[in-house]
């Protein structure tokens, strides 16, 4: 599995050229992309500016010598590469397993091009096998949790290693929704967007046109 992740990370790095502002995703697969960019910066004198999507990715990029800027310090991002937790047949996706969904969606929104890198296990006909993360303001979050229970979304709190409620980089909580099959991802996204106290959710609908997939038969690119 790790070899598949590394393959797509290296493949995605081929789309990066000197002079680009590059969005650096978060997660185990995106980490291989960042690692390959670091190698190219050191060995090929690749000149880029990275915009990170989490404190974890910032630390990795700094250690690799990749120059960084905030999303607010650049005019736009040329290309963002990130992983995904689940992708349906229309290239809608669920992200946020690494608790970085808010920063990931902000960087993706201001990117000219956006690519996901995954192994084939992340592909499915419909979304729903992976939990939908919802980042929420801490104040009033128990009330939101009850709302999700009433909607039969089987909510659970995202916890840290100590068993306490995880706090995101932006100082929010995450409530994970467990919905067996999401027939209409956009309808669910619209519903969540209207809920007071919801900061962002992990439904990334109609945001990517290209997915790089690694599988038993090698690396392939799915475009839409």
From Swiss-Prot:
GO terms for biological process: pentose-phosphate shunt, non-oxidative branch. Keywords: Isomerase. The active site is at residue 104. It comes from the Bacteria. InterPro entries: NagB/RpiA_transferase-like, Ribose-5P_isomerase, Ribose5P_isomerase_typA_subgr, Ribose5P_isomerase_type_A. One of its GO terms (molecular function) is ribose-5-phosphate isomerase activity. It catalyses: aldehydo-D-ribose 5-phosphate = D-ribulose 5-phosphate. Its EC number is 5.3.1.6. Pathway: Carbohydrate degradation; pentose phosphate pathway; D-ribose 5-phosphate from D-ribulose 5-phosphate (non-oxidative stage): step 1/1. Signal peptide: none annotated. Substrate binds at residues 26-29, 82-85, 95-98, 122. Belongs to the ribose 5-phosphate isomerase family. Catalyzes the reversible conversion of ribose-5-phosphate to ribulose 5-phosphate. Homodimer. This is Ribose-5-phosphate isomerase A. It comes from Lactococcus lactis subsp. cremoris (strain SK11). The lineage of its organism: Bacteria, Bacillati, Bacillota, Bacilli, Lactobacillales. The gene is rpiA.
């Amino acid at each position: 599995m790790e070899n598949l992740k590394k393959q797509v990370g290296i493949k995605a790095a081929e789309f990066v050229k000197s002079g680009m502002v590059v969005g650096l995703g978060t997660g185990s697969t995106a980490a291989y992309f960042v690692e390959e960019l670091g190698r190219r910066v050191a060995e090929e004198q690749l000149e880029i500016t990275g915009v990170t999507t989490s404190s974890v990715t910032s630390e990795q990029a700094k250690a690799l010598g990749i120059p960084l800027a905030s999303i607010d310090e650049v005019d736009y991002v040329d290309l963002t590469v990130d992983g995904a937790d689940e992708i349906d047949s229309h290239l809608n996706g669920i992200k946020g397993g690494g608790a970085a969904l808010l920063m990931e969606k902000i960087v993706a929104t201001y990117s000219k091009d956006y690519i996901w890198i995954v192994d084939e296990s992340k592909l499915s006909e419909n979304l729903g096998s992976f939990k939908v993360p919802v980042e929420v303001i801490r104040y009033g979050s128990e009330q939101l949790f009850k709302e999700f229970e009433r909607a039969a979304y089987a909510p659970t709190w995202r916890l840290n290693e100590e068993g306490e409620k995880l706090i995101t980089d932006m100082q929010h909580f995450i409530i994970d929704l467990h919905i067996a099959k999401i027939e209409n991802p956009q309808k669910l996204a619209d519903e969540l967007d209207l809920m007071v106290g919801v900061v962002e959710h992990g439904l990334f609908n109609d945001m990517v046109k290209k997915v790089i997939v690694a599988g038993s038969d090698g690396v392939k690119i799915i475009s839409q």
